[in-house]
Design a protein with these regions (language model features):
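Catalytic-loop motifs flanking and including active-site residues across diverse enzymes
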Residues: 29, 133-136
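A conserved regulatory-domain signal marking ACT and ACT-like small-molecule sensing domains
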Residues: 136, 141, 145-241
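Substrate-binding/catalytic subdomain of NAD(P)-dependent oxidoreductase enzymes
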Residues: 4-103, 108-110, 129
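Glycine-rich phosphate/pyrophosphate-binding beta-alpha loops
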Residues: 55, 119-121, 125-131
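C-terminal transmembrane helices and immediately adjacent loops/tails
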Residues: 115, 121-123, 143-146
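Low-complexity, glycine/alanine/valine/leucine- and proline-rich hydrophobic stretches
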Residues: 91-116, 130-131, 202-220
Length: 241
């Protein structure tokens, strides 16, 4: 189905706003990720430092190619503490189809939390629609009222008692993030072209995890070629491209 038709249906059902910009460009997800990251790490993270990318650049063929390779495309927000700062990013991501979070569909949302003692835990539920939204708003109001009616000395601070809660934490720019990449390109249908591309990637120390090469459509002179890479910095990938 065409993206515009699906978006109109989502708007008619109340799952997307009349102005869908915040929904389809990842801005709403980035707002939520900033709040969740602040609570998780006990420090005030800033929304404007969150890398944000929406779903408008995804084409239907990308969904099909991902499934053929054993993945599903999900719009994911990632907040992760690493040795030199915090990764804070929202963008489409390929998730192995066997993972639970890859099977979160429709209006359902999920939050995957990885902690030291418990390991990974998944929280799953409806994330759009009038009733789920109303439920969340009422829950927030109840929390505010409880805080106001609790003696000040017994209140738990929003950022708990983290020793560096007010410190200036380093949010890594997207250029410094290391992750695997999905590349779709069109190559001339002749011997040696794919080898040339792999050499360019290899010259930048980018290792290839998988290659998917499709047959040309009709009399087309170019063929779609899909590369999955191993982890590499965004800056390195951009340089190779």
């Amino acid at each position: 189905r065409d993206f515009k038709d699906v978006l109109k249906e989502a708007q008619s059902l109340g799952y997307a706003e009349a102005d869908p910009t915040f929904d389809i460009e990842g801005i709403d997800a980035a707002h939520k990720l900033t709040i969740l990251g602040s609570i998780a790490f006990g420090m005030p993270l800033q929304f404007d430092k969150t890398y944000t990318e929406g779903i408008t650049k995804i084409e239907q063929q990308d969904v099909l190619y991902a499934e053929e390779l054993g993945y599903r495309i999900k719009h994911v927000g990632i907040s992760r503490k690493v040795k030199n700062g915090i990764e804070q990013r929202v963008h489409p991501t390929l998730i192995p189809e066997r993972r639970l979070i890859a099977n979160v569909d429709g209006v359902m949302n999920a939050v995957l939390v990885k902690s030291d003692a418990v390991g990974p835990t998944l929280y799953y539920g409806a994330g759009a629609g009038s009733e789920p939204t109303a439920s969340a708003v009422v829950a927030d109001i109840v929390d505010v009222v409880r805080a106001l009616t609790t003696d000040p000395e017994n209140r738990v601070p929003h950022l708990a008692f983290q020793p560096d809660a007010l410190s200036d934490i380093n949010i890594l720019p997207i250029e410094e993030i290391e992750t695997a990449y999905y590349l779709r390109m069109y190559a001339i249908d002749k011997p040696g072209v794919v080898a040339d591309v792999t050499k360019i990637l290899g010259d930048s120390d980018i290792s290839i995890e998988a290659i998917l090469q499709k047959e040309p459509a009709g009399n087309a002179s170019c063929i779609p070629v899909i590369f999955l890479t191993q982890c590499v910095r965004e800056k390195t990938m951009n340089g190779a491209i």
